[in-house]
């Protein structure tokens, strides 16, 4: 299945453009560019993404349900309307103890913070 961008210039309701699929994690690209991407996801109860790291910060926003985000072994419970920024280079897991839908936004700056 091809993961194409959401149609431009057309109104949509984010929570309605993705459905739950039993025993699955479903992802749909809203917009994807070389400088970053916005993705909407649905996680069925009991599903999770394996632990990973990203070279960029990730803005994660729950639009329906409740998500568990584990960042460097610290668990965060997010409910509808809540958000968290997953820091770049941090080990993290996204888990569905109950099903949820979310939006993830990654902006690829190409630069790490530099302290002087």
Can you say where each PLM-predicted feature lies in the sequence?
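Short beta-strand His + acidic residue motifs that chelate non-heme Fe in jelly-roll/DSBH
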Residues: 49-51, 69-70, 86, 91-97
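Ligand-binding loop in jelly-roll beta-barrel domains
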Residues: 88-112
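Conserved short histidine dyad/triad with adjacent acidic residue
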Residues: 24, 39-54
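A cytosolic small-molecule/anion-sensing beta-strand core signal
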Residues: 63-64, 79-80, 98
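Structural motif
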Residues: 37, 66-68, 75, 91, ...
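Short acidic-glycine-tyrosine-enriched beta hairpin
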Residues: 73-88
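A short, N-terminal "cap"/entry segment at the start of jelly-roll beta-barrel domains
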Residues: 1-35
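Glycine- and acidic-residue-biased ligand/ion/polar-headgroup-sensing regions
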Residues: 56-68, 72
């Amino acid at each position: 299945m091809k993961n194409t961008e959401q149609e431009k210039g057309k109104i949509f309701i984010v929570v309605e453009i993705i459905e739950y699929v039993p025993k699955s994690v479903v992802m749909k690209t809203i917009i994807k560019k070389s400088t970053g991407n916005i993705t909407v996801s649905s996680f069925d109860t009991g599903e999770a993404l394996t632990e990973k790291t990203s070279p960029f910060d990730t803005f994660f926003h729950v639009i329906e349900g409740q998500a568990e985000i584990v960042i460097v072994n610290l668990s965060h419970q997010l409910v509808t309307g809540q958000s968290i920024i997953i820091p770049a280079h941090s080990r993290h897991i996204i888990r569905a103890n109950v099903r949820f839908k979310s939006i993830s936004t990654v902006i690829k700056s190409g630069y790490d913070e530099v302290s002087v």
